[in-house]
Amino acid sequence: MFHRTWTVLFILMGIFVWCEASSGATPLDSLIPRRDLPGGWVLIHGPQIYNKKTLFEHINGQAELYLKYGFRQSVFAIYQDKKKAQNQIEVDIYDMGNVVQAFGVFSRFRNEDRPGGFGLDSYLDDHSASFYKGKYFVMAYATESNPDLMSQFSKLIALKISDSSPPPKEISYFPKSGFKAGSIQYFPEGLLGHQFLKRGFQGTYVEEVEVKDKIEDKNKAKTGGKEFNLFLAIFKDSQEAMNALKVYKDDLSKKGKVSPESLIQIGTNALKGEDPYQGKVIVLQKGFYLLGVLGFEKEEVGENRLAEFMKNVK
C-alpha cells in the first residue's frame, strides 16, 4: 500500500512538471537582461515584480489603462552607465495575457510611425523605446538621448521572449491604400466611444480633398489631406453583431441622421448616415464583425475603402 501511494505521487509530480514545461511558462524576471549588456552598463535595481494589486504603486496614473487591457504582472529594472551615474535606462516588461492585449497597450502608447526593428512592432525615439512580442509589452526610457542604445536593450529583451504568437490577424484586414502608417489601435471596450460596439480595432486613412489657398489666392484651390477612420468591432457571434448594428442605427437616428439610401449592393445588414461629431458613416455586418468607415468627405472614397476592407475580412 505504501509503495503504491508513492508510485502514484511520483506519477502525479511527473505530470505536473511535464505540464509546466510544455506550457512554455517563462518567469517574468528572467526576461530582464543581466549578461552581455552594452559596454559600460550595469543593472543597479531590480528585477522588481508588480501584480494587479501593487501596480498602482509603480505607475499610479496609468495602472487603470493596463488593467483594462488584461494586465497580469510586470517586472521593472534600472540600468546605469558606470562612467556617468546620472545616465540611466528604466525598463518595464508587462505580461498582458495574450498578443491582442499586448498590441492594444502598445498601440495606445505609440505616438507615430517610428519603427525600431524589434518585436512584432515597435516604436523608437531619442529617449524611449517600446514594442510588443507575444503576450508581452515592453517600455524603456533613457535619461539621456541615445536611440542606438535603446535599440540594443530592446533587442536583448526581444531575444529572451520565446512567445512566438503572430500579430493579431485583424491588423492585416485593414486596406493599404491611403493608410496612415502606425495608426491602428485596439480597444478592449467602448470602440469609438460607443459601449455597444464593445472591443475592436480602428485605423486612420488620408483622403485627398480640395481646399482653398488662403495665402496666395482665395479663389485658388489646392489638394490637402483629410483624415477618416475604418473600424472593426468584434462580437461573440453574428446575432450579437446584428443586435449591435440595430442599436447603432437607433443611436444614430437620435443624435444624427440615418440615410434612407439603399445599400443592398453591399449587404442587407448595413447602416448609412451622419454622426454630428464623427461625420458621414457607413456600417456593415459580416459574420461576428461590424465593419465601418466614418469621417470621410467623398462618398466614393468611403465606399471603396470599406469594400476593400470587407473583402479582406475572413
Language-model-detected regions and their locations in the chain:
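Bacterial N-terminal signal peptides that target proteins for export
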Residues: 1-9
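Bacterial N-terminal signal peptides
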Residues: 8-17
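Boundary at the C-terminal end of the N-terminal hydrophobic targeting segment
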Residues: 19-25
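Short Gly/Thr-rich strand-loop-strand
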Residues: 40-70, 86, 95-134, 173-198, ...
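A short acidic-to-branched-hydrophobic micro-motif
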Residues: 67-107, 138-140, 207-213, 217, ...
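Short, surface-exposed beta-strand/loop micro-motifs that present aromatic residues
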Residues: 74-82, 125-132, 200-223, 271-273, ...
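Extended intrinsically disordered, low-complexity coil regions enriched in Ser, Thr, Gly, Ala
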Residues: 95-117, 144-166, 226-260, 296-314
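A surface/extracellular/periplasmic glyco- and lipid-processing/surface-interacting theme
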Residues: 138-195
